[in-house]
Each structure stands twice: as C-alpha cells, then as structure tokens.
Amino acid sequence: MKTSMFLTLTGLGLLFVVCYASESEEKEFPKELLSSIFAADSDFKVEERGCLGDKCDYNNGCCSGYVCSRTWKWCVLAGPWRR
C-alpha cells in the first residue's frame, strides 16, 4: 500500500513537471516566432521603414519616433497607447 501511494505521488509530481515545462515552452514560442519573422537583414531594409522592427535593448536605443518594446525587444512606433 505504501509503495503504490509513493509511486502514485511520484508519478503525479513527474506529470506536473512535464506539463509545466511544456507550457513554458509554448509561452516562449510566439515570441521566438515573431522575432524570427521581424528579424531583417541589413541588406533588405527599406529606408522608409527606418528602425521599425530592428532589434534593440535599453542600452542600444531606437531611432527618433520609435521606442524599444519591453515584451518583444524590437523597435516599435511610439504612441500614446505605449507605456
């Protein structure tokens, strides 16, 4: 009886860990997908776009009129809806 309870609890714990790991991977997938879509090589950039879609961080800022998105880490248009 003790062994079966131990195996049941161990199995439930393992199931929890596997589900948590797969869920965290699913949360990262959209960020990686969008980053790869908007990652542009410097040869293909159009001058009209300026900095839109460029990778950035807080040390390496964006062009004027653009801000670094906290979530996606690329330059986006600045606007009143941005925090």
UniProtKB/Swiss-Prot annotation:
It is found in: Secreted. Exists in two forms, due to cis-trans isomerization at Gly-79-Pro-80. The trans isomer is the most abundant (75%). Expressed by the venom gland. Belongs to the neurotoxin 10 (Hwtx-1) family. 51 (Hntx-8) subfamily. Hntx-8 sub-subfamily. Residues 22-49 form a propeptide. Disulfide bonds join 51-63, 56-68, 62-75. The keyword S-adenosyl-L-methionine does not apply. The presence of a 'disulfide through disulfide knot' structurally defines this protein as a knottin. One of its GO terms (cellular component) is extracellular region. This is U5-theraphotoxin-Hs1a 1. Agglutinates human and mice erythrocytes. This activity can be specifically inhibited by mannosamine. This lectin shows very low toxicity in both mammals and insects. Its main location: secreted. Keywords: Cleavage on pair of basic residues, Disulfide bond, Knottin, Lectin, Secreted, Signal, Toxin. Pfam families: Toxin_12. One of its GO terms (molecular function) is toxin activity. Residues 1-21 form the signal peptide.
